[in-house]
Each structure stands twice: as structure tokens, then as C-alpha cells.
Amino acid sequence: MRCPKCQHNKSNVIDSRQAEDGNTIRRRRECDACHARFTTFERVEEVPLLVVKKDGTREQFSRDKIFNGILMSAQKRPVSSEDIENAITRIEQNIRRNHDGEVDSEVIGNLVMKELADLDEITYVRFASVYRSFKDVDEIEELLQEITKTVRAKKESKK
């Protein structure tokens, strides 16, 4: 593993443990040359997932694309990067479990919306307003009524 500081290609593993998602190994390393410490992550290389877009084209599944979409919707909201990463991990696991190498972009969008509904209502509404491409205010109002019912039901179940 190449050191990010001096580019030397020899390092020693100081600590190794399983990351929270259970699918990744987190390793602390120390460079043999400059003694800088850095973290690496190791995960199993899985069969690539292909996303089938609305126009029929296919592209490789991208965690970064989902992360950036959620991050934009979560600006100035109490949603951490870790929350987003965990949600994306659940989405990807769901897709790998239930689809054979290809998944429609609509399925991914719906899974993201489901995760965001549980994570933060405002982030959910922001994401939905872009994802669903609302045509008028009435469609937004329907979404707000839907999320309001869900939030009230959650509050009632906690009592």
C-alpha cells in the first residue's frame, strides 16, 4: 500500500478490525519510510451492478452518485455523513440481495426515498422534489400530506 504522504510502497499494519457495516476491514498502517500513519479499507470485490436508466441505457451503480444526491438534500440538516453511508449500504445490500446484476433506476430512487423517510423528513421532501419532478404545487402538497401522516404515526407509536 502506497503511503499518501511520501508515496513509499511499504507499510506495516498496526491495527485491523471489522468496520461497522460488517463487510469492510479497517486497517491502520504506518509507512516504513516516513512513519506517517494512515487508514485503509478493504472490502470484497463484488460483481458490478448495472443501473438501467429510464431511456434504457445502462451504467455502473455508483455509491458516490447516491451519496451526493442525498448530501445535497441534507444540507443544513442534522444528517451525518455516517448516516448517509449507512443508508447507502442498506440500499446496496437490498439491491444485491433482490436483483441479479441489473436494477432499474426507479427502484434505486424508491429505496433512497424509503431510507430518507426514516432518516429525516425534510431531507426526504427535498430529495423527492427533485427525484419525482413535480409538475405543480398540488403534487408537492400530496407528498407533504403523505409524510405528515407517516411522521404522526411514528410519534403515536413512540407514546
Curated annotation (Swiss-Prot):
Binds 1 zinc ion. Belongs to the NrdR family. The lineage of its organism: Bacteria, Bacillati, Bacillota, Bacilli, Lactobacillales. It comes from Streptococcus thermophilus (strain ATCC BAA-250 / LMG 18311). Signal peptide: none annotated. Negatively regulates transcription of bacterial ribonucleotide reductase nrd genes and operons by binding to NrdR-boxes. Residues 49-139 form the ATP-cone domain. A zinc finger (unnamed) spans 3-34. Residues 1-21 are annotated as: Disordered. Keywords: ATP-binding, DNA-binding, Metal-binding, Nucleotide-binding, Repressor, Transcription, Transcription regulation, Zinc, Zinc-finger. PANTHER family: TRANSCRIPTIONAL REPRESSOR NRDR (PTHR30455:SF2). One of its GO terms (biological process) is negative regulation of DNA-templated transcription. It comes from the Bacteria. Its cofactor is Zn(2+). PROSITE patterns: ATP_CONE (PS51161). One of its GO terms (molecular function) is DNA binding. This is Transcriptional repressor NrdR.
